[in-house]
Amino acid sequence: MTWSTSFLVATSLLSIINSVHAQLTGSVGPLTSVIDKAAVKTCNVCDYGASSDNTTGVGQPIIDAFTDCGSGGLIHVPEGDYLLKDWVSSENGSAWSIQLDGVLHWDSSPSAQSYIFAITGGSDSELSSSNATGAIQGSGYLYHRHNTYTSPRMLYISGVSDWTVHDLVLVNSPMPHFVIDGGYNGEAYNMAICGGDHGGLDGIDLYGGNIWIHLMVTNKDECVTSKTNSHNFLIENIYCNPSGGCAIGSLGSSVNVTNILYRNVYTWDSNQMMMIKTNGGLGNVSNIVFENFIGHGNVNSLDLDSYWSSMNAIDGVGIYYHNITIYNWTGTAIDGETRPPIRVICPEDMPCTEITLVQIDLLVEEGRYDEYYCAIACGGYCLDSATSTLTTYTTTTYGNSASTGYEAPTMADDLATAFGTTASIPTPTTPASFFPGVAPVSAVAGSS
């Protein structure tokens, strides 16, 4: 069901989108190239006692190599299989890189909730693979088959500036795969993150500033999720295959999320295409754009829920959501009658304003129609058209017809079934594209 807008609204929408397109505040990624770092010094972990026999521990050799190359140089893990049974933590490095061309296999013995691989502090850092086959295999199924989900996380970036992680595969983490905790001027791209079919196995959770993300996630929880104190993110060319879906939240008190663009997001067989989730709280979420979303077989599509029942209520009148644009969404929802494809529920005491929905084509797979359900907000579709103080209200509208020129292509790599939790997950190949008809911004390493 598509609703037309006036020329004034369309012009305003383009102005909003164009301003957000440029919202990265500067360059992202390392300040020096891998070639320049290698020219300073190269530390091969095999020279520090590592062996690609998947028996000898590689953790301490990586740590020792960082001692020599962490202040300028390249740490190289050659092709092969390596056993990782020690936490690897690198702190305050500068002008350094890890070239992971082999596969690190996590030993399931440590069960603490720490990080398998952590990069904290410092700047000009890079973790990558030169052939797109380098991987960290988390052996999560060894925990999950015993119903253990309080266990290690995989990759952690904290307090680092001018960094990148790319052309790397993260597989079967015991808990969340990739956490970016206060990273700045960073980029994660050309990655395949592949986890089990269970909650808590997040793809990427991030907060910080000036970050660019483009990659694929397979799991059953967060795909790429922005947290409190997130600013100036460009999250584009995202492939959730399948996943819990992308989100902002969950959000609590002292929330400040601004200048976030999700663009070219393809969501297959997931919980939602996009969710903003909180239950009470205080703060501000503004200048947000969700542009060019394609979805198929998803339980929910757009879900802004200010009373999300999966989190405990937090003190406060609610978060102020304003200047949020949802533009050009196509695809299908499983059952538009029982799960409204558009669901916008704002706080009763803090109505949303400037919520703009344009060109929404979400068709029903089961049932007779799509139901759009909105409450306490102004904008389009089922949102109130008022621009002044809103009184409490709810509205429901219906539809199930596509606009002229409707297109919602699928992807060749869409998984027919999700991975379970009790068997090993094979290391996937990074896909050739993360969104229909769009080539990666940078060519996948090793591709012709």
Curated annotation (Swiss-Prot):
GO MF entries: polygalacturonase activity; rhamnogalacturonan alpha-L-rhamnopyranosyl-(1->4)-alpha-D-galactopyranosyluronide lyase activity
GO biological process: cell wall organization; polysaccharide catabolic process
The keyword Flavoprotein is assigned to this record: no
UniProt cross-references to Pfam families, sorted A to Z: Glyco_hydro_28
Residues carrying covalently attached carbohydrate according to the record: 54, 92, 131, 256, 284, 323, 328
One Gene Ontology CC term in the entry: extracellular region
Enzyme class: hydrolase
Cellular localization per UniProt: Secreted
Disulfide bonds: 43-69, 223-240, 346-352, 374-382
Family: Belongs to the glycosyl hydrolase 28 family.
Name of the gene: rhgE
Keywords from the UniProt entry: Carbohydrate metabolism, Cell wall biogenesis/degradation, Disulfide bond, Glycoprotein, Glycosidase, Hydrolase, Polysaccharide degradation, Secreted, Signal
Active-site residue list: 221 (proton donor), 296
InterPro entries in UniProt: Glyco_hydro_28, Pectin_lyas_fold, Pectin_lyase_fold/virulence
Transmembrane segments: none
Organism domain of life: Eukaryota
EC number: 3.2.1.-
Protein name: Probable rhamnogalacturonase E
Primary role: Pectinolytic enzymes consist of four classes of enzymes: pectine lyase, polygalacturonase, pectin methylesterase and rhamnogalacturonase. Hydrolyzes alpha-D-galacturonopyranosyl-(1,2)-alpha-L-rhamnopyranosyl linkages in the backbone of the hairy regions of pectins.
Signal peptide feature range: 1-22
